[in-house]
């Protein structure tokens, strides 16, 4: 039952984030700037490479941050560290750091609520794959 809840919440989160990404990119300066910055990194990647990157990063980050770190250090601190590792070399990427902190809180809340890592893993992989694909295509 907890697995089903975790996967359901992860799916709902992923659907919401993937749906809001194009809206934010169209309507907010910070999302447009972030999109433009990441486009140079993502546009050369093939669909296969994006999928491998999404799978490996989503699984590894969730296992480390939610699976290993959060039970010891708590939701807020783990989310702050998650955001901090998403710091880029340019100021425009500060929005990515903030977004990563919020996503860390979201992934971590699903884990806190259910005690199951697979919903956050599903959400993280899904969001990464769809949003990288969106950035590459637009």
What positions do the PLM features span?
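Juxtamembrane helix-loop-helix connectors linking adjacent transmembrane helices
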Residues: 1-57
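Transmembrane helix-loop-helix hairpins at the membrane interface
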Residues: 30, 41-138
């Amino acid at each position: 039952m907890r697995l089903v809840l975790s996967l359901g919440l992860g799916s709902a989160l992923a659907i919401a984030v993937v749906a809001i990404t194009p809206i934010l990119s169209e309507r907010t300066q910070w999302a447009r700037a972030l999109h433009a910055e990441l486009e140079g990194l993502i546009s050369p990647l093939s669909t296969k490479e994006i999928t491998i990157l999404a799978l490996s990063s989503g699984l590894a980050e969730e296992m480390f941050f939610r699976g290993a770190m959060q039970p010891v250090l708590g939701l807020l601190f783990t989310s702050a560290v998650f955001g901090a590792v998403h710091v880029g070399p340019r100021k425009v990427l500060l929005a990515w750091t903030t977004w990563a902190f919020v996503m860390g809180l979201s992934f971590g809340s699903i884990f806190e609520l259910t005690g199951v890592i697979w919903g956050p893993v599903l959400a993280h992989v899904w969001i990464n794959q769809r949003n990288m694909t969106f950035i590459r295509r637009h």
